[in-house]
């Protein structure tokens, strides 16, 4: 991804990126609806293997989000944590601390029952820190979206030194 401003805030350490992925709980999924953007907040799970990031989302078995993914699988996402406003002596010194991950990828709807179980386990591990197992019947009532991330960046803004 190109065009990042404030490159001094970017970092690439995988362990630090994993901390953000574990700490954040909501991912903002950007989709394309014709010539209009459409963004939806979602809970997520992830798998990071050798620097490759795969995101899993779950939701209803029908709806606008799924229709848009079927029409155009290109997606963009953002997630963040450590959001804390800070004050300054003048207006331009006010700001907010954060840590974020943004990525672009291709979304697909998972049909395989075993992969759906795996995805739901990953989602619950990310959201709760606990391990869960899922029966086949549980996979039938949700749709799993898998995002194969093509590229991602991470960025943070610490609080200013006083």
Question: What is each residue range found by the language model?
Answer:
Residues 28, 56, 76, 104, ...:
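Beta-strand secondary-structure signal
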Residues 24-61:
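Short beta-strand segments
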Residues 31-33, 59, 79-81, 149-151:
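Short, structured patches in soluble enzyme cores that scaffold and shape functional sites
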Residues 60, 64-87, 94:
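Helix-adjacent hinge/juxtasegments
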Residues 2-6, 82-162:
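Charged, gly/pro-rich active-site loop segments
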Residues 11-12, 23-28, 127-130:
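Short Pro/Gly-enriched beta-strand edge/turn motifs at strand-loop
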Residues 1-23:
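Extreme N-terminal tail/first-helix region
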Residues 20-21, 68-69, 123:
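A generic structural signal for nonpolar/aromatic side chains embedded in well-ordered alpha-helices
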């Amino acid at each position: 991804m190109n065009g990042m401003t404030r490159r001094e805030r970017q970092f690439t350490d995988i362990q630090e990126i994993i901390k953000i992925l574990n700490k954040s709980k909501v991912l903002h999924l950007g989709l394309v609806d014709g010539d209009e953007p459409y963004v939806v907040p979602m809970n997520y799970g992830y798998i990071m293997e050798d620097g490759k990031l795969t995101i899993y989302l779950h939701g209803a078995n029908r709806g606008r989000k799924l229709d848009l993914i079927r029409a155009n699988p290109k997606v963009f996402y953002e997630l963040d944590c450590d959001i804390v406003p800070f004050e300054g002596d003048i207006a331009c010194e006010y700001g907010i601390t954060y840590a974020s991950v943004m990525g672009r990828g291709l979304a697909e709807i998972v049909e395989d029952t075993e992969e759906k179980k795996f995805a739901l386990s990953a989602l619950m591990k990310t959201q709760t820190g606990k391990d869960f197992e899922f029966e086949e019947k549980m996979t039938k009532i949700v749709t799993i979206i898998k995002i194969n991330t093509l590229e991602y960046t991470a960025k943070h803004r610490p609080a200013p030194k006083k």
